[in-house]
Structures are given as C-alpha cells and as structure tokens.
C-alpha cells in the first residue's frame, strides 16, 4: 500500500482508505448485512486500508458502530475519521455530536474530525472554536473539513488560534475535476491533504464500452487494472 503524510503533520496514512457511506444502511440503520460488512472492513484493513472514514449521518450512526466493532483490539493500528451533520455545526451541536461518535466508535479519541458540510446559517467561527476545544480536550487529534471551497477553507483556518486544518474531503475523479480550479491548488499551497471521495465515480469510472476500452488499453501497458488507472 502506498502511503502519504497527512497535511502538515507527521502522521502517515494509506493512500487508499475505506469510505463507509452505505455501511450499516443508507440514512437509517439496516442490520441485515452487518456480518458481511464487518468482514469487508476487516479485509480492507488486512490489505492495508487502515484509514476508515465514516459519519454520524451514515446509517444514523450505525456505520460508526460497525467501525467501532471492527476497531476492537486494534484501535492503535487504525486512523479513524468521522464527520457530523451540518445542522450540528453550532458549538453545542458539535460537542454533542463528538460525544455520540465517540460512543458509537467505542473509542476515547477521534483521529480526524471533519466538518461534513458548511452551514451558512451558523458562523464558521462558532464551528471552528468547538473543533479547537475538542482537540484541546484530547477527544480529537486533527481537524478536517469536507465539501469546503478554497475561500471557505481560508475563512475556517483564520478562526483557529493554534491548530491547522489538515485535510479537505471532496469529490474527485476522472469525470469530476472541479477541485482542480481552486481547491486543489489552495490545499497544495498550505500543505493540506485532499481526501478524495467517489474516486471511481461510484463505479461509473470503469463502466461503459468506450471508457473500459480506453482504461483497459492503458492498464495493459502498465500491468494494472482499469480501476487502478482511474485512481492513479
């Protein structure tokens, strides 16, 4: 597994992690596939995908609960990231969300806590002060964002007194390259990691006769798979 540094930290994370949207259900809990999904997460860990990203929104917290089950006995081997719902972007809302996530994840700290979406109705200063408080209290190790524009990242960073935003999780794949306009250049300029979600466009990147033919030709030339080509 290729590895990379997380932002301006000394933390090394795998280049490919496990996204947990759909694990445990969609937006409500669904226990029917728990056993299979736990095995899938465990296999991913065995293959080196020790970064696991979830959210309190996924399956109404059940996704976090499954990650908590998987992490039992090997918490120190994992880098666990989670997020909170935008309606909870207030100071009090974030503190309460963090406590719920800690319980769901069966852990006493979250490696990377991310603001899932900006919420224009709640001042970013209030949001980031709560994030900084969680770091100061030892409940969160690093602060991240998700779905933030470059300007929104700047506004968020300017609020923080002594902490840094180490990442921004955004959609990025062969067919959605919007972040290359301003988000990616900004992240590179401040050494903040871009965590790409939907890197295969939910499977669509390797679907379709023309796409498959092109990716297959490149894959054969480089002894890779079409999916590896799409990600690289």
Where are these regions (language model features)?
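N-terminal binding-site loop/beta-alpha segment at the start of enzyme catalytic domains
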Residues: 1-78
